[in-house]
Amino acid sequence: ATIGPDLSHRRTIVAQVLRTQIVREAVRDEMKARNLSRRDALKVARGYAYEIAANYSHPFVVFMSGVLGRLWNRLYDGVELANFSSLESVEDGAEVIYAPCHRSHMDYLLLSYVVYHKGFAVPHIAAGINLNMPVIGSFLRRGGAFFLRRSFSGNALYTAVFMKYFGLMMARGHSIEYFIEGGRSRTGRLMQPKTGMLAMTVRSYLREPTRPVVFVPVYFGYERLVEG
């Protein structure tokens, strides 16, 4: 399987985000708005960056691929793929954005498992902050998850840090996965798509068009949902 682009240490990524102009300007605005010292405002920004950033571990992904292979055969009658050739035909060097429907918590595990076994880099996955729980949050980060809050409203510093982290992932060529519906369907039916992450993807590309962007829609169909 492909490891993908340079997987710098999480601390390195955070440091790169904090050095960018957009974040430095947001830090200055935070200092003025909350009457903070530069050190304290930077501490807030750094906290946001660590809250967001993935902590991808390739050995962990290799281990989990074996665990998940056994899990699929236990829960389901195997895994069937359709139209995977559309991904295989994507040109080398393109930025791949997986945009799946979201019917089960198994979705992101299944997509990572499939692309890994097909020889592609495991995507970085946008996950809701509600999943950043003790143990589970660390588990997901090591599999490539990065976390976002449900609302960015009223927090310009958090917005700047998240947008720059997301843009940096794109510029570095990491494939990214986000659920276009915004959340998990509780009924199993497809929901109306939301445009927040899509708009952020377009803005990031327009600011730094280093490579073509290819959107890959993904549909999951299950014999039964483990959530009931």
Specify the residue positions occupied by each region the protein language model found.
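Membrane-interfacial terminal anchoring regions of lipid-handling membrane enzymes
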Residues: A1-G228
